Amino acid sequence: MDKSKRLFLKSKRSFRRRLPPIQSGDRIDYRNISLISRFISQQGKILSRRVNRLTLKQQRLITIAIKQARILSLLPFRPKAQRFKRSQSTARTVGLRTRNK
């Protein structure tokens, strides 16, 4: 193979195949909170199928299970609101406008 054609060939990098997020023995059910909570974001949203790396059927079952768990109060609709701690107030001296009389 001449040098001009060799430049366009991509090197084959080896990659490690990840394990599927749902094993064959896992049962997708609204009562299985430990499994369901893996597919919910920090904000409490259901993660997309691309992020979860699930099949279409698995994603549908996960979505239904999450919604059922929310209705039955096993999962919250919204995560707990984080309280912001107020720091001690400091006097603001820079940038204050003074009124001309």
UniProtKB/Swiss-Prot annotation:
Gene3D superfamilies per record: Ribosomal protein S18 (4.10.640.10)
Gene Ontology CC annotation, any one: mitochondrial small ribosomal subunit
UniProt entry tagged with the keyword Protease: no
Top-level lineage group: Eukaryota
Cellular compartment(s): Plastid, Chloroplast
BP-aspect Gene Ontology terms: translation
Molecular function per GO: small ribosomal subunit rRNA binding; structural constituent of ribosome
Alphabetized UniProt keyword annotations: Chloroplast, Plastid, Ribonucleoprotein, Ribosomal protein, RNA-binding, rRNA-binding
Main location class: plastid
Pfam families recorded: Ribosomal_S18 (PF01084)
Family: Belongs to the bacterial ribosomal protein bS18 family.
Subunit structure: Part of the 30S ribosomal subunit.
Protein name: Small ribosomal subunit protein bS18c
Taxonomic source organism: Oenothera biennis (German evening primrose)
Lineage: Eukaryota, Viridiplantae, Streptophyta, Embryophyta, Tracheophyta
Protein encoded by which gene: rps18
